[in-house]
């Protein structure tokens, strides 16, 4: 006997057929019943399948040469942060790409020590850096956040691996959605590992279906009732800034990321209501009260836990850029001082 699984009628290309005996190997095909969405990366998405494949190639090659386990996981998360950073004003535009292109050999022989040096610089305050530091390195900001703190074993690169990393740099990461960040990044792992880890991607639509009636709709309704009351607006602002959220099985942080983003959008609406005169604020940093440490999660595996933590920094930065555009002041939280509390 055979079973057919199809997410919706009229979608013949999505139909999966298999024998009942093979059900255990195809149970993921029924993920749509629980709101899980198949990992599909559209070509128009900046973080598209090309990015996932490039990171996957780098992951596979590093693993082949023996760079594996915890060091590899941390290494990849760091690289992806750098790729995101140079396209979103955390770094200067193409700063990471230029460093690789102009400060490392084409054969990749010195890429590993050069990256090691960069990671150390990103974890060192400017005033504590060596006075004779390479000028291109010296321009990188102090990131902190413990992301670059751990000293990892030295990796090893060749010509193809260096080019693969550069191919990742050539992709535009500026529009990356941290909501699919974890799903995309875990796609560098092989399918068998993904199935064992239960690395599902819950669609943004389904996450919103859950959190809106749970608390978001109520908060927006409360805001609508007091948005013209200058006395109650600060009280409401304080209320949402004191909220705490926990996802006890957070995976790569999809729920946490989208929840935080929606709360930051609500905060922007509050600030907009407080600034009806259009005069702006003297210091935007003083009136941004929501931060990533209001979000917490529990995850058994270290890799998705680290991804979730970084994804929270990324969505926070995106929302800070939105604030910057809204009120005409550049606002970025660097060095990183707070983080989502992800326990693994």
What is the meaning of each model-derived region?
Residues 340:
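Short, conserved active-site loop motifs that form the nucleotide-linked donor/cofactor pocket
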Residues 18-262, 294, 298-307, 311, ...:
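Preference for the N-terminal adenyl/adenosyl cofactor-binding alpha/beta module
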Residues 92-99, 222-241, 263-293, 316-337:
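Flexible phosphate/Mg2+-sensing switch loops adjacent to catalytic phosphate-binding sites
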Residues 1, 311, 315:
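Metal-dependent nuclease catalytic cores in nucleic-acid-processing enzymes
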Residues 1-9, 76:
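Nucleic-acid nuclease catalytic cores
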